Curated annotation (Swiss-Prot):
GO MF annotation terms: 4 iron, 4 sulfur cluster binding; electron transfer activity; metal ion binding
GO cellular component: cytoplasm
PANTHER family: PHOTOSYSTEM I IRON-SULFUR CENTER, PHOTOSYSTEM I IRON-SULFUR CENTER-RELATED
Function, as annotated: Ferredoxins are iron-sulfur proteins that transfer electrons in a wide variety of metabolic reactions.
Binding residues for [4Fe-4S] cluster 1: 8, 11, 14, 46
Protein name according to UniProt: Ferredoxin
Source organism: Megasphaera elsdenii
Heme is among the record's keywords: no
């Protein structure tokens, strides 16, 4: 998973949904760390579609 910085509005929905705590707040966007298990929960809750598995 990765965050598309142009789309991310830093709402925090992804970070609060992540079951492994793999999403951390960065300076301009949220960052997906190595503890991501690719479950897709963050992608499903992102209101702007800023998270992609590609």
């Amino acid at each position: 998973m990765h965050v598309i910085s142009d789309e991310c509005v830093k709402c925090g929905a992804c970070a609060s949904t992540c079951p492994t705590g793999a999403i951390e707040e960065g300076e301009t966007k949220y960052v997906v760390t190595d503890s991501c298990i690719d479950c897709g929960a963050c992608e499903a809750v992102c209101p702007t579609g800023a998270i992609s598995a590609e």
